[in-house]
Design a protein with these regions (language model features):
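Residue-level detection of the helix-turn-helix DNA-binding "recognition helix"
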Residues: 12, 38-42
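Key DNA-contacting residues within the recognition helix of helix-turn-helix
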Residues: 34-35, 48
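Short, charged recognition helix plus adjacent turn
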Residues: 24, 59-72
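DNA major-groove recognition helix of helix-turn-helix/homeodomain DNA-binding modules
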Residues: 45-60
Length: 72
């Protein structure tokens, strides 16, 4: 699962929050956020804003390809 897919799942878990609502909460336009989601290119600062908008903490982990488990 890539970062954008994970963000979309989180939006569903947060009472079906829309991309427009997330964009507003992160201080950007819906179009700008949609473009970032299409490219699936995120800076850590952007992910931190999204986490804050979702009332969550950002947890970055490396996942082993063979086992699909976190390395640490």
């Amino acid at each position: 699962m890539n970062s954008t897919e994970y963000i979309r799942l989180c939006l569903v878990k947060r009472n079906n929050m829309s991309v427009a609502e997330l964009a507003e909460k992160t201080g950007q336009t819906r179009q700008n956020l949609s473009n970032k989601m299409q490219r699936n290119e995120w800076k850590q600062a952007e992910l931190e804003k999204i986490a804050a908008a979702l009332d969550a903490d950002l947890d970055i982990r490396f996942i082993d390809h063979a086992t699909d488990e976190p390395i640490i």
